[in-house]
From Swiss-Prot:
This is Stromal cell-derived factor 2. Keywords: Repeat, Secreted, Signal. The lineage of its organism: Eukaryota, Metazoa, Chordata, Craniata, Vertebrata. GO terms for cellular component: extracellular region. It comes from the Eukaryota. It comes from Bos taurus (Bovine).
Length: 211
């Protein structure tokens, strides 16, 4: 329902499933695909039975699951205006739309692989500095058809999937965790969603480049 309501909000320019916007922007609501394991970043009101006990974050193969939408926001204690292009090297927050908790990591051990736990934390979009992730990509901006990595700004692990699979109550879902080593397991791509129209800033920069 949260995603549907965004479509009805005045002034938004939606591009669900289309590719006519080159850059990813603040305020966009997207699904993120781990390109190595073909699963989308997912969360739900199911808590880890070990580690932090916080809300679990997993990877799912379903394309249609509404629990895989994440809102792109500025880093903790900042505001990133809607439509602002995300620069490579910029710290951001990813807020789970349906529960209002932020993608988060800390020095707890993940339950299946023994890597660093990744959870969803906070209330109504507000958590702490451990919710910040730096976008790693080539070029000036995060582009929609490009692969990116997300580096945890505090602990420096990379958001990863290596294929470990949960049993009940979330049978078939893959573990998402943090890893220190860069590999094919930590590449992500923006897929379905509601993409905000890029701001005038990007247009102005493009104009100056042409001059």
């Amino acid at each position: 329902m949260a995603v549907v309501s965004l479509l009805l909000f005045g002034g938004l320019w939606s591009a669900v499933g289309s590719s006519n916007l080159a850059v990813v922007t603040c305020g966009s609501v997207v699904k993120l695909l781990n390109t190595r394991h073909n699963v989308r970043l997912h969360s739900h009101d199911v808590r880890y039975g070990s580690g932090s006990g916080q809300q679990s974050v997993t990877g799912v193969t379903s394309v249609d699951d509404s629990n895989s939408y994440w809102r792109i926001r500025g880093k903790t204690a900042t505001v990133c205006e809607r439509g602002t292009p995300i620069r490579c090297g910029q710290p951001i927050r990813l807020t789970h739309v349906n529960t209002g908790r932020n993608l988060h990591s800390h020095h707890f051990t993940s339950p299946l692989s023994g890597n660093q736990e990744v959870s969803a934390f906070g209330e109504e979009g507000e958590g702490d500095y451990l919710d910040d992730w730096t976008v790693l990509c080539n070029g000036p901006y995060w582009v929609r058809d490009g692969e990116v990595r997300f580096k945890h700004s505090s602990t420096e692990v990379l958001l990863s999937v290596t294929g470990e699979q949960y049993g009940r109550p979330i049978s078939g879902q893959k573990e998402v965790h943090g890893m220190a080593q860069p590999s094919q397991n930590n590449y992500w791509k923006a897929m379905e969603g509601i993409f905000m129209k890029p701001s005038e800033l990007l247009k102005a920069e493009g104009h100056h480049t042409e001059l």
